[in-house]
Swiss-Prot record:
Family listed: Belongs to the ribose-phosphate pyrophosphokinase family. Class I subfamily.
Broad class of where this protein is predominantly found: cytoplasm
Gene name for this UniProt entry: prs
Protein name: Ribose-phosphate pyrophosphokinase
Record's subunit section: Homohexamer.
SUPFAM superfamilies: PRTase-like
Keyword Cytoplasm carried by entry: yes
Cofactor: how bound: Binds 2 Mg(2+) ions per subunit.
Gene source species: Clostridium perfringens (strain 13 / Type A)
Amino acid sequence: MENHSKNIKIFTGNSHPELAREIAKALNIPLGKAEVGTFSDGEISVNIKETVRGCDVFIVQSTCSPVNNNLMELLIMIDAFKRASAGRINAVIPYYGYARQDRKAKSRDPITAKLVADLLTAAGADRVLTMDLHAAQIQGYFNIPVDHLLGSPILAKYFVEKGLADRDDVVVVSPDLGSVTRARKFADKLNAPIAIIDKRRPKANVSEIMNIIGDVKDKVCILIDDMIDTAGTITNAANALKDLGAKNVYACCTHGVLSGPAFERINNSAIEELVMLNTIALPEGEGLNKFKSLSVAPIMADAINRIYDDEPLSGLFQD
């Protein structure tokens, strides 16, 4: 890519500095110099170590766990760049936290996804670049441009290269009714049929498998979802598929939130491999043999380059 180092700057908070470094490398520019830490009382401290006057600034920060710290880091960084006279301030949020609170599910619930959008705008963001929002309509919560990239083409490419396209024994499985559209588009890229798991969720983070619609016996099954949190849904689905005679079970998602018992559940499940995008950093350590992480840095860098050059991003939105 053309070197825009005089006018474009990539900065990062503490949520995912490795991804920010990958994006900067793909753009052939150095990562911007900033110190983001905390004062002794826990307040967040931001110190920009280079001039950004008139520059296009891109702040890479997923609002994953610890969600509130990462969100406040992002807001304070946006404010710092605004007061440092940055030309345009772009919030690059690979994983947008609070996206599941996008509506009033019951009386007196907040709509926190809208609140976060308002906070980002009030802080001074001029644009948001994100990937696979849990609810696509969150784009409408903003009064600034939102570029919404899709992760499924990256995941589909991985399975095509793995030799799982154009085969009679492969089926793409939606883990719930809400993911059917995603599963269908994903299946089209593999030229595979789909199956659907009808589940009932008695309470938050608890799922129960009810029925599987479609033929999975002696099939290689690929489960796809936008995110995996406590992994109850995906592991229950995988075990149910195996019980019904599935030959192999793979799973994939854009966002590996992986909170609570997720790692234990996945390692003890019928899932042979879980493929995720690195919108959230995968923790280091043992017990990760089933986990595969694919980088979103190339598509993020391409999007950033197009934003800087005022070129259309429509070619990146194709699912």
